[in-house]
């Protein structure tokens, strides 16, 4: 845990001279990683599930708004399922998190992002599975006619690939470990739709229950991206690794040491603080998506005979 910008975020986005030396020393490993990722994706067996599958993905590791994007577009349709890996969950294998808004498992079993999706998508079913094809098959079994695939670009499915592109890219366009990309940056050209922040969508934030002295607590990737949305009432920032569980005793200690009046958390972090007795303020993030993007997704969904306008 750090209260300033984490080491890895500096390494990938604003490296020091020493870090740049390390980056170029590791570059041969990045080339190997890139080749393996590309070969694995392009030689994988093709799956066609005969229903529209919309993959909301990104090329960089870590957060880029995939979950808020799905939260924004999935409610526009009926008979929908969301299939995700379920990062940092306590469970293994396929788990049905919710069926049409009826939540079946606790947050730790689902993972924070999948649980957040289940809480907010009342008309959708949410499924987690390391093997996404099993998740899609379960969605079909549940009667879903549209599937949103969280982070599915690397899977060789017959799907509509939408890639989110951040406003601020990593410092170097390299793959891991020298850069933050999981695929060659040229893979943007393979997407059906590239959705660029501040061009094709805008982030809109609000704070529920703001107080005079808020202690920011978050476990998201690249947490300094929140800085642009933080009010002056934030007295300190506590950063944890992405998806990390929170130590409630540590939070209580920091809360009183900083004379805080509430913890400021994101909606994603909030699902892990259901047992927290401290006052909570919530930084709500929503996306305003360009109509042309929505029209492209509509066009793909309507190309399947099982989806007519009355079902949208």
Curated annotation (Swiss-Prot):
Pathway: Glycolipid biosynthesis; lipid IV(A) biosynthesis; lipid IV(A) from (3R)-3-hydroxytetradecanoyl-[acyl-carrier-protein] and UDP-N-acetyl-alpha-D-glucosamine: step 6/6. It catalyses: a lipid A disaccharide + ATP = a lipid IVA + ADP + H(+). It is an enzyme of class 2 (transferase). One of its GO terms (cellular component) is plasma membrane. InterPro entries: LpxK. GO terms for molecular function: ATP binding; tetraacyldisaccharide 4'-kinase activity. GO terms for biological process: lipid A biosynthetic process; lipopolysaccharide core region biosynthetic process. ATP binds at residues 60-67. Pfam families: LpxK. Keywords: ATP-binding, Kinase, Lipid A biosynthesis, Lipid biosynthesis, Lipid metabolism, Nucleotide-binding, Transferase. It comes from the Bacteria. Its EC number is 2.7.1.130. The keyword Amino-acid biosynthesis does not apply. Transfers the gamma-phosphate of ATP to the 4'-position of a tetraacyldisaccharide 1-phosphate intermediate (termed DS-1-P) to form tetraacyldisaccharide 1,4'-bis-phosphate (lipid IVA). Belongs to the LpxK family. PANTHER family: TETRAACYLDISACCHARIDE 4'-KINASE, TETRAACYLDISACCHARIDE 4'-KINASE, MITOCHONDRIAL-RELATED. This is Tetraacyldisaccharide 4'-kinase.
């Amino acid at each position: 845990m750090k209260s300033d910008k984490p080491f890895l975020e500096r390494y990938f986005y604003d490296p020091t001279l020493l870090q740049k030396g390390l980056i170029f020393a590791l570059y041969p490993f990045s080339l190997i990683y890139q080749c393996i990722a590309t070969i694995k994706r392009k030689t994988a067996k093709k799956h066609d599930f005969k229903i529209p599958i919309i993959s909301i993905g990104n090329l960089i590791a870590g957060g880029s708004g995939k979950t808020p994007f799905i939260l924004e577009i999935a409610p526009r349709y009926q008979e929908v399922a969301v299939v995700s890996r379920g990062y940092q969950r306590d469970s293994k294998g396929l788990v049905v998190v919710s069926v049409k808004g009826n939540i079946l498992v606790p947050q730790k079993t689902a993972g924070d992002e999948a649980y957040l999706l289940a809480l907010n998508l009342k008309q959708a079913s949410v499924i987690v599975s390391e093997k996404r094809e099993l998740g899609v098959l379960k969605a079909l079994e549940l009667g879903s006619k549209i599937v949103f695939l969280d982070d599915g670009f690397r899977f060789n499915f017959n799907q509509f690939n939408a890639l989110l592109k951040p406003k601020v890219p990593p410092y170097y366009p390299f793959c891991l470990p020298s850069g933050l990309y999981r695929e060659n940056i040229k893979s943007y050209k393979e997407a059906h739709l590239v959705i660029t922040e501040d061009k094709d969508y805008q982030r809109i934030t609000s704070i529920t229950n703001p107080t005079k002295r808020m202690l920011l607590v978050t476990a998201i990737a690249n947490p300094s991206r929140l800085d642009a949305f933080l009010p002056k009432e934030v007295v300190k920032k506590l950063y944890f690794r992405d998806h990390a569980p929170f130590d409630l005793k540590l939070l209580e200690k920091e809360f009183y040491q900083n004379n805080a009046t509430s913890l400021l958390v994101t909606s994603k972090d909030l699902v892990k603080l259901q047992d927290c007795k401290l006052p909570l303020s919530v930084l709500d993030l929503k996306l305003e998506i360009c109509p042309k993007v929505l029209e492209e997704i509509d066009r793909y969904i309507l190309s399947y005979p099982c989806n007519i306008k009355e079902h949208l």
